[in-house]
Amino acid sequence: MATTNITIPARSASGPEGKHAPARMKFYVDTKRCIECGGCEVACKNENNVPSGIARIRVVTVNEGKPGETNVAVPCMHCSNAPCVSVCPVDALFHRADGIVHVNKDTCIGCGYCLYACPFGAPQFPKGSPYGKRGVMDKCTYCAGGPEEPFSATEQELSGSNRIAEGKLPMCASVCSTKALVAGDAEEVSNVVRARSAARGSAAGSWGWGTAYPNN
């Protein structure tokens, strides 16, 4: 059973893209292991050339300096029934066939509905013009590029790295030294969650899991 952040190779996206699709790729954020090192934040910025002011993943400390202090890495969770996808009035947000949530920046109108709908606060709206799109939503792509031509200059500019198409995992999970971030094939990631929960005697530490993947 996988016990690290290196799960089995990502399944290729097959079949049509659509409004919703089952989550075949998942994130597991283990708050019992996060040490707030910031490695995921730096790796994401470097891998995707994310400009200043944008954080596709961020580490938040809850109850800092108090009993029960908890560190939480917050990416886009690419939810099974993503509320951001449901509320987008122009269908700029959609699920790929593998369940990864993408945004078409040529379609996005910057209305902000997705930000209000997201339980994780993942959507961001830069006031400047990174990626050449003023006010258009940006978020974690699971290092899967975007709807643009894979590996094209346009994809790199608008969406960033496409590690998934290369058979690699998101950079944040790849560099996590404590394996607090686990990413990859849904079944394998779920096995890690179950194993850690069983070892602890509870699901403590499985931040956001039940919200993002309610049937798992």
Q: What function would you assign to each model-found segment?
A:
Residues 1-216:
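Non-ligating segments of multi-cofactor redox enzymes
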